Amino acid sequence: MVHLLSFAALASAAFVSVTATPTRRAMAVAEQRTVPITFASAGKPAADTTLDLRIALKQKDMEGLEKALFDVSTPSSSLYGQHLSLEQVAAFAAPTEQSVNAVTQWLQENGVADITPSGPFNDWISFSVSASKADELFDTNFEDFVHIESGERFVRTLQYSIPQDLVQHIDLVHPTTTFVKPLVQRPVMSVPVPGTANVTERALGAPSSCNSVVTPACLQSLYGIPTTRATQSSNKLGVSGFIDQFAQTADLRTFLANLRPDLSSTTTFTVQSVDGGVNTQSARQAGIEANLDIQYTVGVATGVPTIFITVGDNNADGVNGFIDIINALNAESAPPQVLTTSYGFDEPDLGSALATRVCNAYMTLGARGVSILFASGDGGVSGGQSQSCTTFIPAFPGGCPFHTSVGATQGVNEVAADFSSGGFSNVFARPSYQSGAVTTYLNALGNTNSGKFNPSGRAFPDIAAQGVNVEIVDGGSAGLVAGTSCSSPIFASVVSLINDRLIAAGKPVLGFLNPFLYANPQAFFDITSGSNPGCNTNGFPARAGWDPVTGLGTPNFAAMLTAAGL
């Protein structure tokens, strides 16, 4: 059992009378920004509008946790594979008693009563106040903002302050300056068209039909993925679901009957709910993204128990449940060993403080032996989605160093898909595990795109997989989809199959992947053609070795097994 601070006891200890007017504390600006061009101010909310806010408390020792993460994730380390327990992670990630006391006392002094701990380590304080009270507390001006394209409205502010004497205890207040665009369904479905593209076949001998329609059989041929069933019931593969995208069991049955006839058509997945998420079953409720993600995990990671984690609309974390799903998994004693997500944002949407906090949540989960994979995005160098820009826009969480970013390829000869998002973070520094590979690329790149990206930032993606003309079944009909949304579940399936064999051999699972990946570039098919245009440029070119379009390349299952010591 994790021993965390008792907020009830602390609140009682910190209680002071709120009948008297508290002394105004000196304030310090915590964050500020301008209105993003995709949003417009819509005036002041009513003074009594209720705002659900969260304060992210400073965590005890995230530098220590980062060292521990790399110790257990770097193959050359004597601690490799000795993943941390929930209790061990909590010792790093929980706030200090001093921080809890100080922030709780300040809130109570100002008449805030409903103070609730949240997060797996009680590292957030949640509370609700009126808009007028929030203005007073944070020396700010909350406003209504509207997302111009969708019409969705948010209450946010462009600047807020916190007491100077609490700066050492508070990472951020949220949601305040975060302006995330509504999540959208990435892949677009089209009807399969007969015929094949004129593309050269690759050495592993996938049939030329795979140039036009990608199926599980194509992936098995291209990457050497086995069809034999996994054997370890403790090995779990998690699939994130958002924005009311529902994975259909009927569509999965049809998919398996058509494209994996060697598997029982009754093979299915389990469902886990976060924030009241559901998984409604009907052809009308079919979700292209959800069906894609489930069909290319259940249908590729043969026999691996798969969990569809559906995040509902009942979230107040300001980022569509991205915080809540990681908090939910972090609170579990045995979370799935692999998690794939095919959604994301642009890095500037979150701001550096929130991006860092979410990224650190991935660190806590990775330290426990969870491989976290995200689709890199579909906007080339212009971000998660194609958009106008003058300088390159990093996707999020692409720039986070504690997850694995997956780009896209196409064709049997595997060239870079032109939409594959990649580039360099403006928030996160380049981690040591990729320093050599990225330096080599930048030296070869020379002055190309100079001034349009941050060459010292964390570079992404890390690896890639097929992402064009991928066949799925949706609403009872077969069709083709494209996007890095295809690539992440495919690579996640490969990792899960390797984990199955590791567990069977009595070895630890791969866990946080990146140090292992960059230490073993020979375990991937290097992609040397294509680019990811955007921002009125040709983007970055793919080339020998790592590149910011396809990363280290696509999986070679046999070589990855060897690298894993199997």
PLM region spans:
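An often Trp-containing, charged/polar helix-loop segment at the C-terminal end
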Residues: Q410, N449-K452, V495-P548, N556
